[in-house]
Amino acid sequence: MKASVVLSLIGYLVVPSDTAVLGRCVVAKKLHEGGLSDFEGYSLENWVCLAYFESKFNPMAVYENSRSDFIGYGLFQIRNHDWCDHGRNRCHMSCSALLNPDLKKTIECAKTIVKGKRGMGAWPSWTLNCQHSDTLARWLDGCKL
């Protein structure tokens, strides 16, 4: 009896840390529906790869890099200095809008970023992990779009 009470109490105290994490195929579908398939010449696989290496598919991720003095927001860890209202606001939106699991604002801002001269190279993680990968197709394996 005591053990079940203790386990029940522990169950109330433990909050899953990955509740906001989306599945790979869910991310692929949302990005596809948002028009990122072949946007500016980048395949959907590139976008899914980027999302994984930036946030592990967590649309509510916030990462503060105190060394470089920036904060990254959302699925693509969009940086505050240039893209949202805590900086130059080139995407014309609040940084908190980038934390919505529906991904609409995130996709809108990502399109603005990738139209720039650096394209997806604006994300160092894409350059390191996705750009020349010969296994990009795996990011869509088993996904129904």
From Swiss-Prot:
GO molecular function: lysozyme activity
UniProt keyword annotation of Secreted present: yes
Subcellular compartments: Secreted; Cytoplasmic vesicle, Secretory vesicle, Acrosome; Cell projection, Cilium, Flagellum
CC per GO annotation: acrosomal vesicle; extracellular space; sperm flagellum
Catalytic residues of the enzyme: E54
SUPFAM superfamilies: Lysozyme-like
Domain C-type lysozyme: start-end pairs: 20-145
Gene Ontology BP term (one): fusion of sperm to egg plasma membrane involved in single fertilization
Pfam families tied to this protein: Lys (PF00062)
Gene3D superfamilies according to UniProt: 1.10.530.10
Keyword Lipid metabolism: no
Signal peptide: 1-19
PROSITE patterns the UniProt entry points to: GLYCOSYL_HYDROL_F22_1, GLYCOSYL_HYDROL_F22_2
Disulfide feature: C25-C143, C49-C130, C84-C95, C91-C109
Primary location recorded for the protein, binned into one broad class: secreted
Keywords from the named record: Cell projection, Cilium, Cytoplasmic vesicle, Disulfide bond, Fertilization, Flagellum, Secreted, Signal
Function comment: May be involved in fertilization. Has no detectable bacteriolytic and lysozyme activities in vitro.
UniProt subunit comment: Monomer.
Family named by the database record: Belongs to the glycosyl hydrolase 22 family.
Protein name: Lysozyme-like protein 4
Organism name: Bos taurus (Bovine)
Organismal lineage: Eukaryota, Metazoa, Chordata, Craniata, Vertebrata
